[in-house]
Each structure stands twice: as C-alpha cells, then as structure tokens.
A protein has these predicted regions:
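Hydrophobic/small residue at the entry helix of a nucleotide-binding pocket
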Residues: 33-34
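Short, well-ordered coil/turn residues at beta-beta hairpins
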Residues: 120-121, 144
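N-terminal charged helix/coil linker that caps or initiates catalytic domains
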Residues: 1-26
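Glycine-rich phosphate/adenylate-binding loop
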Residues: 2, 109-116, 126, 136, ...
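Conserved N-terminal Rossmann-fold NAD(P)-binding element of oxidoreductases
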Residues: 27-29, 52
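Conserved SAM/SAH-binding loop
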Residues: 98-106
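Glycine-rich phosphate-binding loop and adjoining beta1-alpha1-beta2 segment
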Residues: 46, 51-89
Length: 251
C-alpha cells in the first residue's frame, strides 16, 4: 500500500521497514550533527526516539542546525526537534529529556530500552560514559567524532575508533577508551586536518555570548569555540543515520 515511506521501501523491502518502525533509537545531542541524525531517521521510518539535550536554540546555531530558525531561538532543542519529527511522521513516538548527559545523570536512562544509541555530544566524559553504558547493555552505538573546524564534507569516513586518523577528538577518545578496556567502537570521523579558526573577538561567542536567558552552558564558560559550516555537520549526521538504518534493517 502506498505510504510516505514507499520510496524507501523500494530499496530496503517491507521486512526492513517493519524493523525500522519497531525500533527505538536514542540520540544524545540534538545539535548540528544530532539534528540531521533525527531528520534522516524519522524520514526513514524509525518508529520511536529518545532525544537528549538540555540546550536551547541560539542565534549562532542558524548557520548549521536544522532546528534553528529565527522563530525557534530560545526554545529547547529537543522540543523543536520533536515537533518537527511529528510533523514528518505523526505516528512516531518521541520522548524528550532536557538534561546534559554525564556520569551523574546516566542512571536516569535504561539503555536496554533502546535498539540503537547515537552519540552526537561534544564532551569526552559524556561520550566515554555513553559508550560504556551502551556496550554494557549490549546495545549498538555509533559515535560522532569532531565536525567543527572542518570544511570538506567528502572527508568523512565510517571506521572503528582504533583505525581513525587525523581527528584530534578521535585521538583523545582512543586513549580514554583503551584505558577502560573498550575493544571496538563504530565512529564517523573526518580525516581532514582541522582549520584553525580566525581569532576575531568582534565575532567571538566568548566575548559576545548571546545564549538565550537561562541557558545552562554559556559560551564564556567554554575553552574553545570552534568554527562551523552548514555543509559539514549535516553530512556527518546523515552518514550516521544511514549506518543506523543499515544496521537496524539487517538485524
């Protein structure tokens, strides 16, 4: 029967579409990468989601985040993403969690509820904890490495974390995961050498923070503010969505 996912079903088949419909995916980090992960998955027929992020849409998100418009500035990212996903597929189930994932909040999540976990967060501590919790629960996880300070979207690769090269974040993650006995981890990374951002305090969030009132993570509290584009994190997010769809449909 013709439906909104018919074009996808022509490639994946009816059985795969049923698997996607019955799957629950947790996406941690609904930003430049995570937003496009959600977009790709909901348009592919995944039936249930948990969205995790405590941030609000900021004016500086408009250059790259699919949820960011002038009208959504100041709104919680998970709420905006949920509304968008339900407009695409009203039948999907989307739960939102307005929290910043850290070891202290890990107990709030039951990873055995998920069929797949997507790590699209920025901090190493959070990323490592996500990997440990997902693997402990036996749930597949894919982790995004650095997408900031990059200009060439064609340089993204899918690989095991221990086979990555050229990505500073991946290097830090390799060390941290090796210390904790993690043997493997599927990641999306770019082998492009990062571009050093221009030091211009007149356009720096560090000196002109315009985060929405009540935002928990101010730019002035961050060590570095990376440069970004519309066409790099979006590609990383869609590659991740493709990997999740492929793995779930073959499970």
């Amino acid at each position: 029967m013709l439906n909104q996912f018919s074009r996808t079903q022509l490639l994946l088949g009816a059985e795969a579409m049923e698997k996607l419909k019955g799957a629950r995916v947790a996406v941690f980090g609904i930003g430049g990468v995570g937003g496009y992960v959600c977009e790709g998955l909901v348009r592919s027929g995944v039936g249930a989601f948990d969205l995790v992020d405590d941030a609000q849409v900021c004016l500086t998100n408009l250059n790259r985040q699919i949820i960011a418009t002038r009208k959504t500035v100041g709104k919680y990212k998970v709420d905006v993403m949920r509304e968008r996903m339900l407009e695409i597929n009203p039948d999907c189930d989307v739960r939102v969690h307005k929290c910043f994932y850290l070891p202290e909040t890990a107990a709030e999540f039951n990873f055995s509820d998920y069929d797949y976990v997507v790590d699209a967060v920025d901090t190493v501590t959070a990323k490592v904890t996500l990997v440990l919790e997902a693997q402990k629960a036996g749930v597949p996880i894919i982790s995004c490495m650095g997408a900031g300070n990059k200009l060439d979207p064609s340089r993204f690769r899918v690989a095991d974390i221990y086979k990555t090269q050229g990505c500073p974040l991946a290097r830090v993650m390799r060390t941290a995961l090796r210390k904790r006995g993690v043997k493997k981890l599927k990641v999306v990374y770019s082998d492009e050498i990062p571009t050093r951002p221009i030091k211009d305090m007149s356009i720096s969030c560090r000196s002109h923070c315009i985060c929405p009132p009540g935002a928990k993570h101010k730019c002035t509290e961050r060590r570095d503010i990376p440069g970004s584009t519309a066409f790099v994190p979006s590609v990383a997010g869609l590659i991740i969505a493709g990997e999740v769809v492929k793995d779930l449909s073959r499970a």
